[in-house]
């Protein structure tokens, strides 16, 4: 069975090797004119400076948490326990590495995309450069995630003999190691998403509010001092943040599936049901194998699009990459399921929760794959200007900004229903065919081809940057037309990616919650989270409000940083003679510093709350309160994230619909366009800061709670004072 780990490490190394190959391939391309090189260098320096400062803050937080873990688990196990802390550090390193590499390639690829468009005037060739750059981020997400899991298995599972059946029945250290590895990934994801989101939207709003709305100059105009900061933000928020986010979801889903397999086994043993050590081993390896197959499928899907002849339809090419990866994953997953579980004793399969025989976990995982594609399609319908919802926002803009906002709110709210129906069906059917393990496998299935989806999502900000460089370098209009078309498709893929991220986060959080319940309840007992229990109900009420508090803090953080940016841009327009005539250069460096300082200052409190809140709640009120807290927060956050992501995406593409000339007499600079710009500006922090951060909030809360579940049960204030557990 251990030989299956060879498939995992081979898939990880193939992905990282192909990522390195594409990284080198992109860097070999020419950067273009001296002006293009100058702008690209400024973006690169700004992005490097921000992520360096951010990682220094993360390092301090990580050291504190690692020391705390060592102390907590030493108390819990009665002997010095360093293993969970080391696994936590491995998770931090893997997630930080993926984010750093992704940000690096984005700052190299952007100018090369612009130059390819300038030289070829061909959208197909330009798309390939952007996708090749995006694939580096996508492949690193899958590669580093599986590499870290492989290290945890090899070092702790086999090296320290934690996978021994007696060890699993005893202290459960291996499952704690997996939880801590997932938490390490979560910490980096939270800081990258929150910090990057505040940075990018503060710069974006500052550039738009003064540049477009007041000075009436085009987007990415070189006269606007906030333009460089805006382009830096695309890299630190939409590339590094996105990659860390989905890497964390990927790891969380796999880890929770493995932990659930162990919990189900121990529960069956406690109930004297017929169980098999070999069956446990197969269930512990199956999530890893399925994820490895998905990673290989993603490599094939990306390679096919990069190697085939380019077309003038970028949306179709990107869909081919994603759908082919999904299809190969389903087929390969069936083969793996057949080889692992076919021939297993029917009674043992039934005890494990496999209600439709050996094929049960494959059905659950495949359902996750399909539901991910469907949720992405729903997001596309509500955010692409090819469809009615976004077109109605553009039409409403003819009557002013108030109706733009109102119509966008309507679209965002209505867009919540169908993804939740899909998630509800997926959750129930997965449970029906394969029990709690099936829900975890649905999350693994949805994320199995994550490298393909992240590659497509990262292509968007790279194309957006390329358009900015083309505009600031004053390249011919045909170049901007190509980059604008790629950017428009990128906005839709970004909305699809956000829907995919929150969908996968909800399934991952649900399986982590189940693992949390197993962690502190007596082995063999039925899982019980009864809402007639006032502790659970109180926790759910508080949890339902928490995403709104968190979102409000993020929006306020963006507003505070954007206000400083607006003041600086206005000052430069007022005090630097000739800047609006193009005779003087703006001071872009000051704007970059404002965004960096604002993001680094404002990100701390939301990030800390997401980690500390469940800990304080657990030690005050115990694990049942925390269980309610997690359910309330998850349900609330899912709906809020879908609403903010789709409303913001629809406002953005509604503006682009007007810019495309689709509404007669209402192009750039028209009253309808001015109203649409207001909608786009309002939607920016919603879709790029709030929405993406909410899915990390529910995952990090679930992971922190899982790690500390036993401590909550044994050492909470209610128990110490009143004896209530």
Label each region the model flagged.
Residues 1-725:
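Hydrophobic packing and interface segments
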